[in-house]
C-alpha cells in the first residue's frame, strides 16, 4: 500500500495490495496490476520475498530462523515440519531444513546465471541481473510472476516463445521446484542409482514424465498446428510444463480450444509433488500402484 512500492508514487488500494501479497505468498501468480509496469523496484522486491517465503514454506523459514538464532526445536515444531515437507520420519528434520534452504538457493542462483545472458542483452546489465534473479526464483517457486510486461503488460513470456535458453531454463526450474525436496534428497544421496530411490520419488518421476509428454503431444498436434515447427515444439513443451501451478505462458491461452483449456485445468488441479513448491492435489494422489485387495 505504500507509495514507495509503486512506480507512480501513489498508494495502492488495500484490496489490490492484499490480493497481490496473497497471490505471491501462496505462489499463485494471479495479479490485478502488471508486476513490471505498476510496481517499483521496492515493490517487486517485496513480491519476490513473499514468493520465496511461500515457495520454501513458512514453517521451513521459521525453523531456519530458530536454528540460526540458536533456539531449540521442539517435538511439535519437528512434527509440523515433517507434515509440511511430507518427510517419512521426524528424525533429521533440522538437517532436512538446512538441505532445503541450500538446495533452493543453489538452484535459483544457477537459474539466474543461465538466464542472465539473455536478459542482460535485452534489458541492460543491472536490470538484466534483476530480471534473471526474479524469474529464476519465481519459476523455481512455481509462482508465475514475471517482469516481461515491461514490453506488453500482462504478456507473461510470450515474447520469448522461441528463445531456447529462456524456455529450457524456466521449464527446468519449474520441474525442479515441482518434484519436491525429498526427491532432491534422493538425487543427492543416490545419484544415478534409481533403484535406491524411495517409492515416492520413483512415482514422482514417472508421473511427471507422463504429465509432460502426453499433454505436449496433444498441444503439438491439435492446438498449435498452425504455427512454425520450431515455435510449435517450444510452445507445446512449455504449456505442458507450466500449468501445474507455475502460471507462466508463452502462448495466448484464450486461443486454445475448450478441450485444450480443460486439459490445462486438469493439469492445474493435479499440481506438483508432496513437499514441493507447487500446489494442487499432488502427483502421488493420482497414482495407484495396485488395486485394493481383501485380506
Predicted regions and their residues:
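Membrane-proximal intracellular helices of multi-pass ion channels
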Residues: 1-293
Amino acid at each position: 500500500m505504500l507509495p514507495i512500492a509503486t512506480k507512480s508514487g501513489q498508494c495502492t488500494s488495500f484490496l489490490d495490495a492484499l490480493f497481490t501479497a496473497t497471490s505471491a505468498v501462496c505462489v499463485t501468480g494471479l495479479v490485478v496490476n502488471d508486476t513490471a509496469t505498476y510496481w517499483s523496484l521496492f515493490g517487486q522486491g517485496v513480491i519476490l520475498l513473499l514468493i520465496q517465503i511461500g515457495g520454501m514454506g513458512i514453517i521451513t523459514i521459521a525453523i531456519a530462523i530458530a536454528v540460526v538464532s540458536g533456539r531449540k526445536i521442539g517435538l511439535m515444531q519437528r512434527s509440523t515440519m515433517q507434515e509440511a515437507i511430507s518427510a517419512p520420519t521426524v528424525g533429521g528434520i533440522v538437517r532436512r531444513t538446512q538441505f532445503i534452504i541450500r538446495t533452493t538457493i543453489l538452484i535459483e542462483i544457477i537459474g539466474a546465471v543461465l538466464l542472465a545472458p539473455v536478459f542482460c542483452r535485452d534489458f541492460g546489465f543491472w536490470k538484466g541481473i534483476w530480471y534473471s534473479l526474479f524469474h529464476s526464483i519465481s519459476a523455481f517457486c512455481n509462482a508465475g510472476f514475471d517482469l516481461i510486461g515491461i514490453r506488453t503488460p500482462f504478456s507473461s513470456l510470450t515474447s520469448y516463445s522461441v528463445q531456447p535458453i529462456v524456455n529450457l531454463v524456466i521449464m527446468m526450474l519449474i520441474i525442479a521446484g515441482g518434484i519436491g525436496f525429498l526427491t532432491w534428497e534422493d538425487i543427492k544421496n543416490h545419484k544415478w542409482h534409481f533403484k535406491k530411490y524411495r517409492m515416492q520419488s520413483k512415482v514422482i518421476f514417472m508421473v511427471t514424465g507422463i504429465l509432460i509428454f502426453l499433454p505436449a503431444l496433444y498441444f503439438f498436434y491439435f492446438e498449435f498446428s498452425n504455427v512454425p515447427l520450431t515455435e510449435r515444439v517450444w510452445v507445446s513443451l512449455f504449456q505442458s510444463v507450466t500449468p501445474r501451478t507455475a502460471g507462466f505462458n508463452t502462448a495466448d491461452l484464450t486461443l486454445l480450444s475448450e478441450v485444450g483449456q480443460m486439459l490445462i485445468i486438469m493439469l492445474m488441479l493435479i499440481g506438483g509433488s508432496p513437499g514441493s513448491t507447487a500446489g494442487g492435489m499432488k502427483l502421488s494422489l493420482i497414482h495407484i500402484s495396485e488395486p485394493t485387495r481383501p485380506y
